[in-house]
A protein has these predicted regions:
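Hydrophobic residues within the alpha-helical transmembrane core of Major Facilitator Superfamily
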Residues: 2-3, 197
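A structural signal for short, hydrophobic/glycine-enriched beta-strand patches
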Residues: 3-186
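A transmembrane-helix-recognition feature enriched in membrane-embedded lipid enzymes
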Residues: 12, 16-17, 186-203
Length: 203
């Protein structure tokens, strides 16, 4: 367990996952659309009238909105939900349009994982002639996401966001010691490595 909370170990786990560079503005000109992946929802958000996106999804939406404002590209949001919840895609559309003033052209709301994000987005976008996409997700999630979307038939321009920076420890009160941020980053990185392995084995 200490492997997942030690800042040095977290850095080792994240090095390859977060190796994709920040997207350059010139690359946006070559894209057909922006695709933003959901990262979860908050079921209890009474201040927002019921449910809303969680922090991970909000980080992705914020950066996706920034890219949309800069480029004018149309946006697809993708994310489903268990049967007792609102689909992430619908929640993401609400946040983008009401809070960031970014219109959402397409909503994919059936997917429950990254592979389905890609497959169901392809069902919407490829028939519309959209093949070259700017893909927005967490930097540590980008490697697995690119593989899934390329396998689904897209040409992907990665647009990573929400880097863990100093390996998840920079916000801790005592950065040299294991802390909550490092623990979260380590858990996230381990999840991504396991997801990559499972994806490649089952492909």
């Amino acid at each position: 367990a200490i492997l997942l909370v030690s800042p040095g170990s977290v850095g080792w786990l994240l090095d390859d996952l977060e190796s994709t560079p920040v997207v350059q503005p010139a690359k946006l000109k070559n894209a057909d659309a922006i695709v933003i992946l959901g990262g979860g929802a908050r079921k209890y958000a009474p201040e927002f009238g019921g449910q809303t996106v969680n922090r991970l999804t909000l980080e992705r939406l914020r950066y996706g909105a920034r890219l949309a404002h800069r480029s004018g590209l149309p946006v697809l949001v993708t994310g489903g939900a268990p049967s007792d919840s609102q689909p992430e895609g619908a929640l993401m559309k609400t946040v983008l349009e009401e809070d960031f003033r970014v219109p959402v052209k397409w909503v994919e709301s059936r997917s429950l994982d990254t592979r389905e994000n890609a497959a169901f987005s392809a069902e919407i976008l490829l028939p519309a002639g959209v093949r070259r996409i700017v893909l927005v997700t967490h930097a540590a999630h980008m490697r697995r996401s690119v593989e899934a979307f390329e396998h689904a038939g897209f040409e992907v321009i990665p647009a990573p966001t929400a880097f863990f920076g100093d390996r998840g420890a920079s916000d801790d009160a005592l950065p040299g010691l294991p802390g909550m941020n490092a623990a979260f980053a380590g858990s996230y990185a381990a999840h991504e490595w396991l997801g990559l392995l499972a994806y490649r084995v089952s492909r």
